[in-house]
Curated annotation (Swiss-Prot):
Enzyme active site: 129
Statement: the UniProt record of this protein carries the keyword Nucleotide-binding: yes
Encoding gene per record: dcd
Residue spans of biased composition, Polar residues class: 163-177
The protein's name: dCTP deaminase, dUMP-forming
Gene Ontology BP terms: dUMP biosynthetic process; dUTP biosynthetic process; nucleobase-containing small molecule interconversion
EC number: 3.5.4.30
Length: 193
């Protein structure tokens, strides 16, 4: 079930959902707007001949920090990682989904490629997969609204929330955009004829 603004406020007020820092004006009818942080992870395309998710490739990206009042320019066709300004913390019976802002999408800005789902139990800054599909550069300002979180109540609490037991996952507690850690639990099924 998708939570309404009433339910979202109740979850925030009780402390079960954490958004830090919280700006109450960001609560929308069925979501909460989130803002862009000042950290970006750029791809160094000359370091490797190709990207292999099975291998650790530490030099694939580099962290760039802009001043709080300095813009980051995302060029046409460019893909960078960013993150939410807010640290998001979910209980074991709520999941969230990151969606883009319609007004930014109409300018050609995509906020996530595939990873819009946030598991119950997650705590950290949400990494954004920012792409410019427009034909002009897009100016990104730290602190600007960049997306929105929708919250979903599970039918029951997760037995193994994110960050616990076998799910002590790769991105729990992350601060800033975190590079891929796909190599840590890469799974490959042998495909038979």
């Amino acid at each position: 079930m998708l939570l309404s603004d009433r339910d979202i406020r109740a979850e925030l007020d009780s402390g079960r959902v954490g958004l830090d820092p919280l700006d109450p004006t960001m609560v929308q009818p069925a979501s909460v707007d989130v803002r862009l942080d000042r950290f970006f992870r750029l791809f160094d395309n000359h370091r490797y001949a190709h990207i292999d998710p099975r291998q650790e490739q530490d030099e694939l990206t580099r962290l760039v920090e802009v001043d709080p009042d300095e813009a980051f320019i995302l060029h046409p066709g460019e893909f960078v990682l960013g993150s939410t300004y807010e640290q998001v913390t979910l209980p074991d019976d709520l999941a969230a989904r990151l969606e883009g802002k319609s007004s930014l999408g109409r300018l050609g800005l995509l906020t996530h490629s595939t990873a819009g789902f946030i598991d119950p139990g997650f705590s950290g800054h949400v990494t954004l997969e920012l792409s410019n599909v427009a034909t002009l550069p897009i100016t990104l300002w730290p602190g600007m609204k960049i997306g929105q979180l929708c919250f979903f109540r599970l039918s029951s609490s997760a037995q193994s929330p994110y960050g616990t037991g076998a799910n002590q996952n790769r991105y729990q507690g992350q601060r800033g955009p975190t590079a891929s850690r796909a190599h840590r639990d890469f799974h490959l099924t042998r495909i038979e004829r």
